Amino acid sequence: MKAYELSIEEAAAKLRAGDISSVELTQSCLQRIGDVEDRVKGFITVDEEGALAQAKAADKALQNGETNPLCGIPMSIKDLLAVKDLPMTCGSKMLEKFIAPYNATIVDKLQGAGAVNLGKVTMDEFAMGSTSETCAFGVPQNPWKEGYVAGGSSGGSAVTVAAQECFFSIGTDTGGSIRQPAALCGVVGMKPTYGRVSRYGLTAFASSLDQAGPLCRTVADTALVMNSICGYDPMDSTSINQEVPDYTASLVEGVKGLRIGIPKEYFAKGLDSEVEKVVRNAIAVLASAGAEIVDVSLPHTEYCVAVYYLIAPAEASTNLSRYDGALYGYRDLESKTLEDMYKDTRSAGFGDEVKKRILIGTYALSSGYYDAYYKKASQVRTLIIEDFKNAYRSCDVLLSPVTPTPAWKLGAKSDDPLAIYLSDIMTVSANLAGIPGMSVPGGFTEDGLPVGIQLQGSHFQEEILLKVAYNLEKLLAIQPGKLDF
């Protein structure tokens, strides 16, 4: 087994035992990046010099008795989180030459733990997309099948983990942007409760929906990363001051007696038969292990996509108004007047999908339409939150598909944006409600494409989600397909 193939748990044990150094782990990942990056296109920026310097520092820390399991472990970071002195493009021409002047809090936490940052990874432009095809600096490809989407917007995070270029990655989830690519690429992805992980230093798409979280190869690895990134941050006004448990402590507990809710609305027309087969198998496996299977209803599911695609663009239109060429980022130098500079800068700096969402959001917030669109969407959002509260009165965890289909060919839905938006139907609700959700690998289709199982819990119940996911991982005992590179 090559060093880059290890799990975080395995690599951490070898580091503590002195069987391998962080420099050797990092060199192994850098070599892997050099070998496969042309195929998967996961990175925007690879910081080889910085990574090796961090690895040397981690080796010294380990020699001095550092026990954090992330010390010396190579990672990647989605390119909308600030890493001091590295580019932060957000996948957009608008920020092509922007260098972050400070670290995001989550980056500080991980660097404090001794993790080694290999670089910044591809993403949909300003996180607006479900396939990562809107990235201005290369489109990531699914490691399991060349020419297929990796999911989005954290496509680069999922790809770099699945292709074994790094041990874990930090992505963000606004409407499924961690869970969907995790499902399509066959890795574990966790969207924590809103406010559980600091958003300071995270470039905002939709401020009431965005949340950072980890993508890893195993559930145990995910728990280890969660231990390091969660917690209150006074620099983030949305951060919630609540004690963080040890997420690894209860993983090995069984699921006997746990109530697993199956939302009937997530098994409706349009669900791919192979996806349903994998999910139904997961339900049966949990039942055989002693979990109680409960049918539940989330009656406002049919409105979730419409609500999300009003609220998210509305917040985006406000957040992205700052990108006008005046202070930082791309500036059109041919403009004759200030007004022309604003117009020309934004026209050239933003891609089509971002401009589309800004237009939708501006319209929804405009005078005469606010009550009809944004206000009404916010009212239905409250009903969606109540749906989850009612469901959790009769169950502990909700289990469902992550996406209605497995990955599809790159470009196959480019002319049908509604089809792409509808692929978010099972994930946007967790963001609207602020609850935690995760994707855990459930199996493969006959074509060898991964299928994810979605678990959702009530606020701050990540511990239960991880326990169910860990048990699923062990019970399913999936024999992963072999990457062809």
UniProtKB/Swiss-Prot annotation:
Domain of life per record: Bacteria
Membrane-spanning residues: none
EC class: ligase
Active site feature: 78 (charge relay system), 153 (charge relay system), 177 (acyl-ester intermediate)
Gene Ontology biological process: translation
Keyword annotations from UniProtKB, A to Z: ATP-binding, Ligase, Nucleotide-binding, Protein biosynthesis
Gene3D superfamilies found in the cross-reference section: Amidase signature (AS) domain
GO cellular-component term (any): glutamyl-tRNA(Gln) amidotransferase complex
Chemical reaction(s) catalysed: L-glutamyl-tRNA(Gln) + L-glutamine + ATP + H2O = L-glutaminyl-tRNA(Gln) + L-glutamate + ADP + phosphate + H(+)
Known EC number: 6.3.5.7
GO MF annotation list: ATP binding; glutaminyl-tRNA synthase (glutamine-hydrolyzing) activity
Nucleotide-binding recorded as keyword: yes
Function: Allows the formation of correctly charged Gln-tRNA(Gln) through the transamidation of misacylated Glu-tRNA(Gln) in organisms which lack glutaminyl-tRNA synthetase. The reaction takes place in the presence of glutamine and ATP through an activated gamma-phospho-Glu-tRNA(Gln).
Family, per entry: Belongs to the amidase family. GatA subfamily.
Oligomer status and interactors: Heterotrimer of A, B and C subunits.
Protein's name in the database: Glutamyl-tRNA(Gln) amidotransferase subunit A
Gene source species: Desulfotalea psychrophila (strain LSv54 / DSM 12343)
Underlying gene: gatA
